[in-house]
Amino acid sequence: MVLVSTRALLLSRRGLHARWSSNAASSSLSDETQASTVGEFASADIEECNSRYRGILQISDAEGKGRGLFASKQFAPDELIMSAKAVAVSDVRGSHSVQTGWDKHVVMDLPGILINHSCDANVGIRDNDVGAYDFFAIKNIKKGEELVWDYNASEWEISTPFQCACGSARCRGLLRGFKHDSMHVRRSYEPFYASYLKQNDQ
């Protein structure tokens, strides 16, 4: 059976070995812990997810990025696309995690974990009641278009900044986290970024 790696493998295929940090956490979940928590997505997992979201979303190959998530229908600005659920929670960062609080890092379920980064995102996030994020369209999205979000909209500080390879004309080059890019995130995505980061704006 063919196994498809998780979000960390997607990053590594692009040479993006990102690690995330909060303002306090300094250690990361081990790769072994992450692997046992997340596992690897078998083709059957992908097929089941695509069946569940048929006519709405599709996990497919994203050129140069491994797997990605694509729209199977049009979405209008502010329209809810999907809700991601936290399947693992920690107070330290991990290679598969996204940050939802100052000392809270979660691993999302499929298909949210496979949404790639872009500096010109078409998707924004809001906190939800299942421990992760709801994903909303922040511009008109056409059928067949890849859904992408800006990782700086959730990560306070990327402890190992990395060179972005999104290919967007608006690519900012080096990704370092909201701490170093707050003006752009607020201007581009308000109100669709992590709630805990908005507390820092006050």
Regions found by a protein language model. Give the residues of each.
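Conserved catalytic SET/PR domain of SAM-dependent protein methyltransferases, capturing the structural core
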Residues: 2-202
